[in-house]
Amino acid sequence: MPIIEISSLTHPGVDVFCMLTEAQLRQRMEPGKGVFIAESPNVISRALDAGYEPLALMCERKHISGSAAHIIKRCGDVPVYTGDRELLTTLTGYVLTRGVLCAMRRPVLPSMEEICRDTRRIVVIDGVVDTTNIGAIFRSAAALGIDAVLLTRNSCDPLNRRAVRVSMGSVFLVPWTWLNGTIGDLNKFGFRTAAMALTDDSISIDHPILAAEPRLAIVMVTEGDGLPYKTIAEADYVVRIPMAHGVDSLNVAAAAAVAFWQLRITDL
């Protein structure tokens, strides 16, 4: 692998790490593919394990023979741009987590049909734009037995750098794609839908009918505006998490973890 010393803020080849927005990264190279940034040896290792293709590395000089050595070795002949901590921080605008970044090619996403095939518990993320929440939801999904994730187009991109980091690489462990259509379309794949919302006719999340469903799609939304009426109307169940001390709602990432645990498949 070529080790390339960065000598200036305009060094050729490093624009992918410091001059492109998330939207520009998504469109780089090939429309529909693009590039994303993974950071830290552990997260990059998970991406490589999942088959993601590395394109370039940026690494603090001191980590080349240290914590990033095994990542550099696994990435083969991709260029490794290096420099001191201060220069790389100035270039990227943030401190590199564990001293290393990896630009990776985006995969072709599976279709909804492929996502729903042979799955029993999926989550639909509706309009969640906060990167931290997206990352936390994916981490809980991976840990608590969710088979796949669907996201509405107005949700945050799961391959956003911060979302990937917060998820600790869990975005590479759970299949995901964008939702085409509405949650009602999931019925044709054999799913019943459970929308997490506070309504007068909602049922408690510990209702036995929910755990008994062989195929269930759990619909999560940011706690700000809640689920749109149309989404609630299309859902087979409207579900609430019972709360104490007058608290009326949880952050969407916390609510997702509760829902995934309560509604998990237990006969594995």
Spans of features found by a protein language model:
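RNA substrate-binding interface of SAM-dependent RNA methyltransferases
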Residues: 4, 42, 49, 80-82, ...
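Short glycine-rich anion-binding loops that position phosphate/pyrophosphate groups of nucleotides
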Residues: 41, 62-63, 87, 107, ...
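A glycine-rich helix N-cap at a beta->alpha junction
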Residues: 74-93, 177
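Glycine- and other small-residue-rich loops at beta-strand/loop junctions that grip anionic moieties
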Residues: 6, 36, 126-127, 152-153, ...
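Active-site/ligand-binding-proximal alpha/beta "capping" segment
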Residues: 195-247
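Structured adenosyl-cofactor binding patch, chiefly the S-adenosyl-L-methionine
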Residues: 102, 140-144, 153-172, 229-268
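Short, aromatic/basic amphipathic alpha-helical patches
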Residues: 66-77, 230-231
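Boundary-proximal intrinsically disordered activation/regulatory segments immediately upstream
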Residues: 1-70, 155-156
